[in-house]
Protein backbone atom coordinates (compact mmCIF):
# COMPACT_ATOMS: atom_id res chain seq x y z
CA UNK A 1 0.00 0.00 0.00
CA UNK A 2 1.04 3.54 -0.64
CA UNK A 3 2.36 5.60 2.22
CA UNK A 4 -0.21 8.25 1.36
CA UNK A 5 -3.75 8.37 2.61
CA UNK A 6 -6.39 7.58 -0.01
CA UNK A 7 -7.79 11.12 -0.09
CA UNK A 8 -6.26 14.56 0.45
CA UNK A 9 -6.37 16.50 3.73
CA UNK A 10 -7.37 13.78 6.20
CA UNK A 11 -8.11 14.56 9.80
CA UNK A 12 -5.66 12.20 11.51
CA UNK A 13 -6.38 10.70 14.91
CA UNK A 14 -3.58 8.66 16.49
CA UNK A 15 -4.24 5.56 18.59
CA UNK A 16 -2.14 2.78 20.09
CA UNK A 17 -3.19 -0.85 20.23
CA UNK A 18 -3.07 -2.05 23.83
CA UNK A 19 -2.81 -5.56 25.26
CA UNK A 20 -6.50 -5.49 26.27
CA UNK A 21 -7.48 -4.81 22.62
CA UNK A 22 -6.13 -8.22 21.59
CA UNK A 23 -8.49 -11.19 21.34
CA UNK A 24 -7.95 -14.95 21.54
CA UNK A 25 -6.58 -14.97 17.98
CA UNK A 26 -3.61 -12.83 19.04
CA UNK A 27 -4.54 -9.68 17.12
CA UNK A 28 -6.68 -6.63 17.80
CA UNK A 29 -10.36 -7.59 17.87
CA UNK A 30 -12.39 -6.16 15.00
CA UNK A 31 -14.79 -4.41 17.40
CA UNK A 32 -11.87 -2.27 18.61
CA UNK A 33 -11.40 -0.89 15.09
CA UNK A 34 -14.97 0.43 15.24
CA UNK A 35 -14.24 2.10 18.59
CA UNK A 36 -11.21 3.82 17.05
CA UNK A 37 -13.32 5.06 14.13
CA UNK A 38 -15.83 6.49 16.59
CA UNK A 39 -13.04 8.21 18.54
CA UNK A 40 -11.66 9.69 15.29
CA UNK A 41 -15.11 10.91 14.22
CA UNK A 42 -15.65 12.62 17.58
CA UNK A 43 -12.17 14.16 17.57
CA UNK A 44 -12.73 15.50 14.05
CA UNK A 45 -16.23 16.78 14.87
CA UNK A 46 -14.89 18.48 18.00
CA UNK A 47 -12.12 20.12 15.96
CA UNK A 48 -14.88 21.45 13.67
CA UNK A 49 -16.74 22.87 16.69
CA UNK A 50 -19.38 20.15 17.01
CA UNK A 51 -18.46 18.88 20.46
CA UNK A 52 -20.53 16.47 22.54
CA UNK A 53 -21.47 19.43 24.77
CA UNK A 54 -22.64 21.43 21.74
CA UNK A 55 -24.77 18.48 20.57
CA UNK A 56 -26.38 18.13 23.99
CA UNK A 57 -26.99 21.89 24.10
CA UNK A 58 -28.87 21.96 20.78
CA UNK A 59 -30.42 18.49 21.39
CA UNK A 60 -29.22 17.19 18.01
CA UNK A 61 -26.54 14.65 17.21
CA UNK A 62 -25.21 12.69 14.27
CA UNK A 63 -25.93 9.00 14.85
CA UNK A 64 -24.72 5.99 12.88
CA UNK A 65 -27.24 4.75 10.35
CA UNK A 66 -25.07 2.28 8.43
CA UNK A 67 -21.45 1.10 8.64
CA UNK A 68 -19.36 -0.64 6.00
CA UNK A 69 -15.94 -1.83 7.13
CA UNK A 70 -13.30 -3.64 5.12
CA UNK A 71 -10.75 -5.33 7.34
CA UNK A 72 -7.56 -5.68 5.30
CA UNK A 73 -4.85 -6.66 7.78
CA UNK A 74 -4.52 -7.20 11.54
CA UNK A 75 -3.18 -4.81 14.14
CA UNK A 76 -1.23 -6.09 17.14
CA UNK A 77 -0.59 -4.91 20.70
CA UNK A 78 1.95 -2.12 20.68
CA UNK A 79 1.14 -0.91 17.16
CA UNK A 80 1.01 2.86 16.73
CA UNK A 81 -1.88 3.58 14.36
CA UNK A 82 -3.31 6.51 12.42
CA UNK A 83 -7.00 6.87 11.64
CA UNK A 84 -7.58 9.21 8.71
CA UNK A 85 -11.13 10.47 8.29
CA UNK A 86 -12.89 12.64 5.74
CA UNK A 87 -16.36 14.06 5.35
CA UNK A 88 -17.30 12.86 1.88
CA UNK A 89 -20.99 13.77 1.66
CA UNK A 90 -23.53 16.01 3.34
CA UNK A 91 -27.01 16.80 2.10
CA UNK A 92 -27.09 19.78 4.48
CA UNK A 93 -30.34 18.51 5.96
CA UNK A 94 -30.15 15.04 7.46
CA UNK A 95 -27.23 12.92 6.19
CA UNK A 96 -23.46 13.02 6.50
CA UNK A 97 -21.06 10.33 5.25
CA UNK A 98 -17.51 9.76 6.46
CA UNK A 99 -14.73 7.68 5.01
CA UNK A 100 -12.00 6.24 7.20
CA UNK A 101 -8.62 4.69 6.59
CA UNK A 102 -6.73 3.01 9.44
CA UNK A 103 -3.04 2.44 8.89
CA UNK A 104 -0.05 1.35 10.92
CA UNK A 105 2.20 4.37 11.50
CA UNK A 106 5.47 2.46 11.17
CA UNK A 107 5.06 0.86 7.75
CA UNK A 108 1.99 2.89 6.67
CA UNK A 109 0.18 -0.28 5.73
CA UNK A 110 -3.57 0.19 5.45
CA UNK A 111 -5.38 -2.13 7.85
CA UNK A 112 -8.96 -1.02 7.30
CA UNK A 113 -11.11 1.17 5.08
CA UNK A 114 -14.63 2.15 6.08
CA UNK A 115 -17.61 4.21 5.07
CA UNK A 116 -20.07 5.23 7.77
CA UNK A 117 -23.37 6.95 7.07
CA UNK A 118 -24.80 9.22 9.77
CA UNK A 119 -28.18 10.89 10.20
CA UNK A 120 -29.03 13.82 12.41
CA UNK A 121 -31.29 12.81 15.28
CA UNK A 122 -33.23 14.61 17.96
CA UNK A 123 -31.52 13.58 21.20
CA UNK A 124 -34.82 13.50 23.10
CA UNK A 125 -36.92 11.38 20.74
CA UNK A 126 -34.16 9.56 18.84
CA UNK A 127 -36.01 10.36 15.61
CA UNK A 128 -34.35 11.82 12.53
CA UNK A 129 -34.44 15.62 12.59
CA UNK A 130 -33.07 18.31 10.29
CA UNK A 131 -29.53 19.27 11.27
CA UNK A 132 -28.93 22.76 12.64
CA UNK A 133 -27.50 25.28 10.15
CA UNK A 134 -24.13 25.27 11.90
CA UNK A 135 -23.88 21.48 11.47
CA UNK A 136 -24.61 21.83 7.75
CA UNK A 137 -21.80 24.38 7.42
CA UNK A 138 -19.29 22.51 9.59
CA UNK A 139 -19.95 19.09 8.06
CA UNK A 140 -19.60 20.24 4.45
CA UNK A 141 -16.92 18.15 2.69
CA UNK A 142 -13.72 19.93 1.64
CA UNK A 143 -13.66 20.83 -2.07
CA UNK A 144 -10.39 18.94 -2.60
CA UNK A 145 -11.96 15.78 -1.17
CA UNK A 146 -15.03 16.12 -3.39
CA UNK A 147 -12.75 16.68 -6.41
CA UNK A 148 -10.61 13.65 -5.56
CA UNK A 149 -13.74 11.50 -5.26
CA UNK A 150 -14.97 12.80 -8.64
CA UNK A 151 -11.58 12.02 -10.20
CA UNK A 152 -11.79 8.47 -8.82
CA UNK A 153 -15.25 8.00 -10.32
CA UNK A 154 -14.14 9.48 -13.65
CA UNK A 155 -11.33 6.91 -13.85
CA UNK A 156 -13.85 4.16 -13.20
CA UNK A 157 -12.47 3.56 -9.72
CA UNK A 158 -15.00 2.35 -7.18
CA UNK A 159 -13.89 3.43 -3.69
CA UNK A 160 -13.85 -0.21 -2.62
CA UNK A 161 -15.43 0.14 0.79
CA UNK A 162 -18.82 -1.07 -0.37
CA UNK A 163 -18.56 -4.84 -0.75
CA UNK A 164 -20.96 -6.38 -3.21
CA UNK A 165 -24.06 -7.67 -1.47
CA UNK A 166 -23.74 -11.42 -0.88
CA UNK A 167 -26.18 -13.24 -3.06
CA UNK A 168 -28.45 -15.64 -1.28
CA UNK A 169 -28.43 -19.18 -2.58
CA UNK A 170 -31.96 -19.87 -3.73
CA UNK A 171 -33.78 -22.99 -2.60
CA UNK A 172 -32.69 -25.93 -4.65
CA UNK A 173 -29.57 -24.20 -5.96
CA UNK A 174 -26.15 -25.42 -4.98
CA UNK A 175 -23.18 -23.31 -3.97
CA UNK A 176 -21.57 -24.31 -7.26
CA UNK A 177 -24.54 -22.88 -9.20
CA UNK A 178 -24.14 -19.56 -7.42
CA UNK A 179 -20.34 -19.50 -7.59
CA UNK A 180 -20.45 -19.90 -11.36
CA UNK A 181 -22.75 -16.93 -11.81
CA UNK A 182 -20.61 -14.08 -13.22
CA UNK A 183 -22.96 -11.43 -11.85
PLM features: residue spans?
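HotDog/MaoC-like acyl-thioester-processing domains
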Residues: 1-13, 71-80, 88-183
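Active-site helix/loop of acyl-thioester processing domains in fatty-acid/polyketide metabolism
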Residues: 33-56
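Small beta-barrel nucleic-acid-binding modules, principally OB-folds
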Residues: 59-74
Amino acid sequence: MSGDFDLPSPYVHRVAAADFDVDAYGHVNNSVYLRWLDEAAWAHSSALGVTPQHCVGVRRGMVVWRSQLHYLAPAFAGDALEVGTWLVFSDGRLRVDRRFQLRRAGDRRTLLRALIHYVCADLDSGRPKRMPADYAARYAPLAEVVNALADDRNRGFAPGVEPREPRAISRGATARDDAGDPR
